[in-house]
Swiss-Prot record:
Catalysed reaction equations from the record: 2 chloride(in) + H(+)(out) = 2 chloride(out) + H(+)(in)
Main location class: membrane
Intramembrane segments: 204-211, 286-298, 302-310, 543-557, 558-560, 561-572, 573-576
Protein name per Swiss-Prot or TrEMBL: H(+)/Cl(-) exchange transporter 7
Motif placement: Selectivity filter part_2: 243-247
Motif extent (Selectivity filter part_1): 201-205
């Protein structure tokens, strides 16, 4: 059972009715004792106040029993609350994935005839095509710039190393390598830390949250895209243990969000197209297509992109959306393939389907037998354990960063330090290695000879002195004997910790390729070891085990199964290994989940995001809507005084975003629910002065169209920017035409799983709780549901924090 220690009201505090309460109704039963799950009596209840600041010294409201009786009210005393995963942030708002079916919406829908409906559908397909084209072009730009900048850097360093190997003074080569890496990473980190912090990392957790219904500030803005693309180029060229494939998912999502709106709010340009799609519901579907197009461009895997969007991203799905997402993915792959083929001088040879090409695995030369399946499962176990270790280390590292490295300047210094350490460690390992291999048959672009004989190269450099994508291909396809076990073991150990340290830096970067590279290294080592131990012919090609190890390691870290299986199959152009890859990924996920969550889910929790999973906690049937709902609720009347509305919207302590509308009755009679209206709608109504004087109630207030609301979307002005005179405060606003007259409601006795299923499946933002007389008694929001989760000790309730 849950240890429910706090009950946090929707408004963040309990308030008595103030003057003017007859016009502004606060419903609910704050004086009634709410049963506790642990059986504690009324005396054990704590205050509703539970507002904290994470990682900062700020004013907080503490529970009454925690206060020193000799001190003044808590507002004057700061307290730092250590950040942990058992906090839920109040700063995140929900997106409106349920259309408000008010009179304006219904009138517009009724006016749409069959021809207009077909036009809207055609526009959806056109937008998906544009998403695919632009995502593919962005991927081409990233790939070409990285190839040229990284090539220039490695050529300069190689020439310097070759020069000083003969005459001595390789320390200067080390200094040059570390300086170049740090310089690139410095620029990449500065633009992220100081201009757009949301562009840090791969962006996959943020896009998952957006598609789940959480409004992440700036996550799909044009500025974020520019910083993301620039940052990932500089991170990869800077030699960090990162990849450019993960951020393509975020980039595709931003492109989709921008194209589908037909305007740029950042550039203040409105092209007057696609106005019908200016709402969260439509934008969500296009962002799903953008995420899939990003995967498709990264790996040349259009089907894998669709499945990734389904498995990891989209919370809401339908058949027509599947077709459009697949179409966008195919267009993205083709665009990338076509442009890169032209760039490489083979205009009609479409041989570059993705940013990374794993190369073709020959089924005849690398066939597997039934006896190898247990070996593959064992590799999945290893991948799950190593993935759990990776995630656990990254968890503690992220906690340290949240507490101590939260200033932008410190974040930039850390990124530069990691870049310098990565270059230093790579140089030392290459310098110390005596693993020399013949140049003939090598796939190295920049072979380093160092102390090897003429015609040979240092094999440790094949892993370190290259972009991560090329290193993965080298481990997959270099012939047997290209690496000795000591080289692979050292590389795996060192790169594992470097990748773990790198993920979470304030740079734009992904974890896909580093995970594949780590897994390919220990997988190849695994195959070599089996060959030594058994001497059997079936163990002959270590590239096969490098592929399985790569899948196991990536699956153990991110815990994807279905989509990753198809991505690996499409990227290798080989269906033969579909079954063993699936076994490896499933085993890695099962083993990893025993110890810790996947990397993306872990970082979502660390950011205290109110993320709703597919199902409610399995042990939550004992909870009802009455126990989880927020009370008291601020309600408005059908015809409300403008001054009351302005005061409600200006209340920064509550920051309400949805208001039940009740019937106009006397103060002595209970008010029944009539509808629901959003803060954003009220803002637009106030901006356009949609009200009349109380003395002239017979006048008709100004009419608005849906276009007026869409023009204000998505950056609705704050209430502070709207001037309302004292005379206007006495006017009256009729909400009947703008409220949603049929909001979803549940009775107080509804179980939490039932409430959760309704809220989650319909993409709701507010769910009204009513009694037997249809009177509002509470409101269920995303945070009310997200704060209950299944912990190691059973059902637990998270604390709400103002981060």
């Amino acid at each position: 059972m849950a240890n429910v220690s706090k009950k946090v009201s929707w408004s963040g505090r309990d308030r008595d009715d103030e003057e003017g309460a007859p016009l502004l109704r606060r419903t609910g039963q704050p004086d009634e004792e709410t049963p506790l799950l642990n059986g504690a009596g009324p005396g054990a209840r704590q205050s509703h106040s539970a507002l904290f600041r994470i990682g900062q010294m700020n004013n907080v409201e503490l529970d009454d029993e925690l206060l020193d009786p000799e001190v003044d009210p808590p507002h004057t005393f700061p307290k730092e609350i250590p950040h942990n995963e058992k906090l839920l942030s109040l700063k995140y708002e929900s997106l409106d994935y349920d259309n408000s079916e008010n009179q304006l919406f219904l009138e517009e829908e009724r006016r749409i005839n069959h021809t207009a409906f077909r036009t809207v559908e055609i526009k959806r397909w056109v937008i998906c095509a544009l998403i695919g084209i632009l995502t593919g072009l962005v991927a081409c730009f990233i790939d070409i710039v990285v190839e040229n900048l990284a090539g220039l850097k490695y050529r300069v360093i190689k020439d310097n190393i070759d020069k000083f190997t003969e005459k001595g003074g390789l320390s200067f080569s080390l200094l040059l390598w570390a300086t170049l890496n740090s310089a690139f990473v410095l620029v990449g980190s500065v633009i992220v830390a100081f201009i757009e912090p949301v562009a840090a990392g791969s962006g996959i957790p943020q896009i998952k949250c957006f598609l789940n219904g959480v409004k992440i500030p700036h996550v799909v803005r044009l500025k974020t895209l520019v910083i993301k693309v620039s940052g990932v180029i500089l991170s990869v060229v800077g030699g960090l243990a990162v990849g450019k494939e993960g951020p393509m998912i975020h980039s595709g999502s931003v492109i989709a969000a921008g194209i589908s709106q037909g305007r740029s709010t950042s550039l203040k340009r409105d092209f007057k197209i696609f106005e019908y799609f200016r709402r969260d519901t439509e934008k969500r579907d296009f962002v799903s297509a953008g995420a899939a197009a990003g995967v498709s461009a990264a790996f040349g895997a259009p089907v894998g992109g669709v499945l990734f969007s389904l498995e990891e991203g989209a919370s809401f799905w339908n058949q027509f959306l599947t077709w459009r997402i697949f179409f966008a993915s195919m267009i993205s792959t083709f665009t990338l393939n076509f442009v890169l083929s032209i760039y490489h001088g083979n205009m009609w040879d479409l041989s570059s389907p993705g940013l990374i090409n794993f190369g073709r695995f020959d089924s005849e030369k690398m066939a597997y037998t039934i006896h190898e399946i247990p070996v593959f499962i064992a590799m999945g176990v290893v991948g799950g354990i190593l993935g759990a270790v990776f995630n656990a280390l990254n968890y503690w590292l992220t906690m340290f960063r949240i507490r101590y490295i939260h200033r932008p300047c410190l974040q930039v210094i850390e990124a530069m330090l990691v870049a310098a350490v990565t270059a230093t460690v790579a140089f030392v390992l290459i310098y110390s290695s005596r693993d020399c291999q013949p140049l003939q048959g090598s796939s190295m672009s920049y072979p380093l000879q160092l102390f090897c004989a003429d015609g040979e190269y240092n094999s440790m450099a094949a892993a370190f002195f290259n972009t991560p994508e090329k290193s993965v291909v080298s481990l997959f396809h270099d012939p047997p004997g290209s690496y000795n076990p000591m080289t692979l073991g050292l590389f795996t150990l060192v790169y594992f910790f470097l990748a773990c340290w790198t993920y979470g830096l304030t740079v734009s970067a992904g974890v896909f390729i580093p995970s594949l590279l780590i897994g390919a290294a220990w997988g190849r080592l695994f195959g070599i070891s089996l060959s030594y131990l058994t001497g059997a012919a079936i163990w002959a090609d270590p590239g096969k085990y490098a592929l399985m190890g790569a899948a196991a390691q990536l699956g153990g870290i991110v815990r994807m199964t279905l989509s990753l299986t198809v991505i690996m199959m499409e990227a290798t152009s080989n269906v033969t290994y579909g079954f063993p890859i699936m076994l490896v990924l499933m085993t890695a996920k099962i083993v990893g989940d025993v110890f810790i969550e996947g990397l993306y889910d872990m970082h979502i929790q660390l950011q205290s995001v109110p993320f709703l999973h597919w199902e409610a906690p399995v042990t939550s049937h004992s909870l009802t809507a009455r126990e989880v709902m927020s009370t008291p609720v601020t309600c408005l009347r059908r015809r409300e005084k403008v001054g009351i509305i302005v005061d409600v919207l200006s209340d920064t302590a509550s920051n309400h975003n949805g208001f039940p509308v009740v019937e106009d009755v006397g103060d002595t009679q209970p008010a029944r629910l009539q509808g629901l209206i959003l803060r954003s709608q009220l803002i637009v109504l106030l901006k356009h002065k949609v009200f009349v004087e109380r003395s002239n109630m017979g006048l008709v207030q100004r009419r608005l169209r849906l276009k007026d609301f869409r023009d204000a979307y998505p950056r609705f002005p704050p209430i502070q920017s709207i001037h309302v005179s004292q005379d206007e405060r006495e006017c009256t606003m009729d909400l009947s035409e703008f409220m949603n007259p049929s909001p979803y409601t549940v009775p107080q006795e509804a179980s939490l799983p039932r409430v959760f299923k309704l809220f989650r499946a319909l993409g709701l933002r507010h769910l009204v709780v009513v009694d037997n007389h249809n009177q509002v008694v509470g409101l269920v929001t995303r945070k009310d549901l997200a704060r209950y989760r299944l912990g190691k000790g059973g059902l637990e309730e998270l604390s709400l924090a103002q981060t």
